[in-house]
Amino acid sequence: MDYVSTRGSAPHLGFEGALLAGLANDGGLYVPETWPTARVDGDSYAQCAAAITHPFVNGDIPFDVYRALCEAAYSSFRHPQVAPLVEVAPDHYLLELFHGPTLAFKDVALQLLGRLFDYVLAKRGERGMIVGATSGDTGSEIGRAHV
């Protein structure tokens, strides 16, 4: 699967290239060129996450390794469902995204993202450094994301 820039003039990249590039060189965001579909039923959150998102990896990470990365990413969440959907009133539901290690919704993405960076960089024999500035809660999530 190729990733394309939202501004349209950057070169197409594969998963690893888009992951490590962050922003496209034309200032756009890299997004998937196509959107595959997946069916999941009754699996754990980590297993569903692996099944749904692995097609976006385009074979750069074997599925068994990818599933293990997902399981590790969500193992520190305080709720067995990771992000339970709770009925708060008849026909009114709330998706609880605060059960991660920093109690912020960003944990849902960053716990996996950090592991993806670690895997790809190790596979390439490279190291990375992320420098960031924040005035909010993002810093604590990144710090706990194993990047």
Report each predicted region and the residues it spans.
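PLP-dependent amino-acid enzyme catalytic core
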Residues: 1-144
